Amino acid sequence: MLSREDFIFTIGYDGPAAIVDGQAKRKFASLSTKELAEKGLFRAAYSSAIYSKDPAELDLVIATYNAAAHTNYDRSFPFDRLFGVFPVEVNKVVVL
């Protein structure tokens, strides 16, 4: 299982390995889901909410995204596809 920090900054996969944006991880890994969303890092914030499995965090990300994008999406919107975030079981991490 990936750590929270590796999961939220995963930019893709190469076979059984997650490819992680090391620069973004170093800069933003300590931020909460709310702080990531407030900074406009919606993909990372969404990933963090998915990783935590906390519905309140997911609602917070959606509300912050809607305010920034002037949209009115709810949980039924396919945010997984929008942000390209899908939980995947991998054990290896490659940091770029």
Each model region followed by its residue ranges:
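Extended alpha-helical solenoid/arm regions of large eukaryotic scaffolding proteins
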Residues: 1-96
